[in-house]
């Protein structure tokens, strides 16, 4: 039963994650990919560390939000395609800056997500 619940949770949240990414891409074009990936780094780290600190977290919710929503929201393939398009357009430095800058910023956003999760979980634990 838990396996079915996990699959349904992933499917449900992936639908919303995909719609959110599509909306960002429509609204911000090229920058939508960057925004989605950096927010995804923050969200995945936040969710992971937040639910690790909560003793009563539900596996189906963690799986659905992490694998489903964040997995559908972020896009490694579009990130690489955008960098490749910059290279093909003769923007070698721009491609290098985009690629390395996004990776470095992703680490920073993941760190910030972990810090925010620890803070939020700590506040919840204080309240009891």
UniProtKB/Swiss-Prot annotation:
User: So what does this thing catalyse?
Assistant: fluoride(in) = fluoride(out)
What GO cellular-component annotations does this UniProt entry give?
Answer: plasma membrane
Localization recorded for this chain is: Cell membrane
Q: Which InterPro entries match?
A: FluC
- For this protein, the parts annotated as crossing the membrane are 10-30, 32-52, 59-79, 93-113
What are the record keywords, sorted? Cell membrane, Ion channel, Ion transport, Membrane, Metal-binding, Sodium, Transmembrane, Transmembrane helix, Transport
Instruction: Note one Pfam family from the annotation.
Output: CRCB
Transmembrane helix listed as a keyword = yes
Quick one: which residues bind Na(+)? 71, 74
Q: What does this protein do?
A: Fluoride-specific ion channel. Important for reducing fluoride concentration in the cell, thus reducing its toxicity.
Protein name, UniProt field: Fluoride-specific ion channel FluC 1
The upper taxonomy is: Bacteria, Bacillati, Bacillota, Bacilli, Lactobacillales
State which gene encodes it: fluC1
């Amino acid at each position: 039963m838990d396996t079915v619940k996990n699959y349904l949770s992933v499917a449900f949240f992936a639908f919303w994650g995909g719609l959110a990414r599509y909306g960002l891409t429509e609204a911000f074009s090229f920058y939508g990919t960057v925004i989605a990936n950096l927010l995804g780094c923050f969200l995945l780290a936040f969710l992971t560390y937040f639910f690790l600190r909560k003793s009563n977290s539900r596996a189906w919710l963690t799986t659905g939000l992490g694998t489903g929503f964040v997995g559908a929201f972020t896009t490694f393939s579009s990130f690489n395609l955008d960098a490749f398009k910059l290279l093909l357009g003769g923007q070698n430095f721009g491609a290098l800056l985009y690629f390395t800058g996004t990776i470095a910023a992703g680490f920073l956003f993941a760190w910030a997500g972990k810090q925010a999760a620890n803070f939020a979980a700590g506040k919840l634990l204080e309240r009891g």
